[in-house]
Each structure stands twice: as structure tokens, then as C-alpha cells.
């Protein structure tokens, strides 16, 4: 085995795919985020043999995929559902990452 791999502790990577509601408002984003947080709690508890250190979610896991022309007409409609780095969603994900000492990635 390569020496570099001898220095890396084995861990579990959780690759998550959940049902996502297409967000019409911030409440829908919260519902999607709550579902994601519950999946993290479940996954960390399920894979107890090796600690979970990485959780990966797909793109749009908080807002869902929207289609321009189907009710969304301007950048303002998209900005109402935008996730910002200093916003509450990122704070909650950061808290969850610290709780379990892991990294969370999402598109």
C-alpha cells in the first residue's frame, strides 16, 4: 500500500439523494433543509463502524430545480430563494458539520 494511504484514516462518505420540493418560498427551502439534516443524522448513526467525515448532496438540494417561464419571470424571483454564504441555511449546515466533525458538500 502506498505510504500516502497509510496516513489517511478510513472514513465513511455519505452520498445523499432525497426528495426535494421545488421551493416557492423560504418555508419550502427550510423543509428541504430539514430533510437533509435528518438524512445526515440518520446516516451518521447508521454507519457506526467507520466515522462519517464527508456528506455530499446533489445540486439544487435546498431549492429544487426551477424552470424559467413557469411562474418565475425575473431575477428577483430567483433571488428570493437564493442561498447566501452568510445566510441561515449555511449557519445550520455549519452547525451540523461541527456537531459530527465532518464536511458537507452540496451543489
Predicted region positions:
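Hydrophobic structural segments
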Residues: 1-107
Amino acid at each position: 500500500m502506498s505510504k500516502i494511504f497509510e496516513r489517511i484514516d478510513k472514513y465513511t462518505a455519505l452520498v445523499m439523494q432525497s426528495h426535494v420540493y421545488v421551493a416557492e418560498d423560504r418555508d419550502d427551502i427550510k423543509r428541504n433543509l430539514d430533510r437533509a439534516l435528518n438524512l445526515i443524522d440518520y446516516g451518521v448513526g447508521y454507519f457506526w463502524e467507520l466515522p462519517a467525515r464527508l456528506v455530499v448532496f446533489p445540486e439544487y438540494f435546498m431549492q429544487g430545480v426551477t424552470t424559467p417561464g413557469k411562474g418565475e419571470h425575473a431575477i428577483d424571483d430567483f433571488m428570493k430563494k437564493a442561498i447566501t454564504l452568510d445566510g441561515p441555511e449555511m449557519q445550520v449546515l455549519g452547525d451540523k458539520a461541527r456537531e459530527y466533525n465532518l464536511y458537507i458538500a452540496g451543489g
